[in-house]
Amino acid sequence: MDSLSQYKVLSAPGTVHYLPNFITEAEETSLLAQVARTPSPRWTQLANRRLQNWGGLPHPKGMIAEKMPDWLQTYVNMVNNLGVFGAKEGVDGIKPTLANHVLLNEYHPGQGIMPHLDGPMFHPTISTISLGSHTVINFYKEEGENSSLKFEDRLVTSLLVEPRSLLVLQDEMYHQLLHGIEEIHEDKIDDKICNLDNSTVIGSIIPRKTRISLTIRHVPKTSKMKLKLGR
């Protein structure tokens, strides 16, 4: 994690590391081509986006581990090498905790995801590589006693996530703040975005394109045996 210190977003309310140009344009092009070649049965279609699970399908009873394809494992290794998932002690001594799951989401302009917490099935670190387009991720307080407040009234901060970047969220950014993406076609840059650089102009409008996100995570509870998940 020491190598990440220069990428920490100091104005964020929790632990955020943002690495622009984590991958090259050539790597992005290769990944997008690989995603485009994915057979249609691999996709799960939802109302507002479609997705793929790689490494297994997370479940409260345990994820049945599957081999990660080589075209994804390369980038899983790149994230693992940063040490973002920490380490744990076992019978063979202290070993790094490694990512074993990738959730691939496809968002067209106008699509997004409702504010949510990722929950206890995952190690409390989210690492996401973005391909093809930027997005803005918003972070909100949970309802608490003020359940009548709309999401916009509970907005804490936002992050501008650019193509080819890596975003790492930890601690209260994982446990306490809901994160979501608005279902809009363009993003207006405002002072709620906490990771703006000097080249970004407040008030500018950025049209969205189709975005692929690779959310790389560690699922602690896994099984090599098929589970009887029930109906």
Protein language model annotation of sequence segments:
Residues 1-231:
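Non-heme Fe(II) oxygenase metal-center motifs and adjacent flexible, charged/small-residue loops
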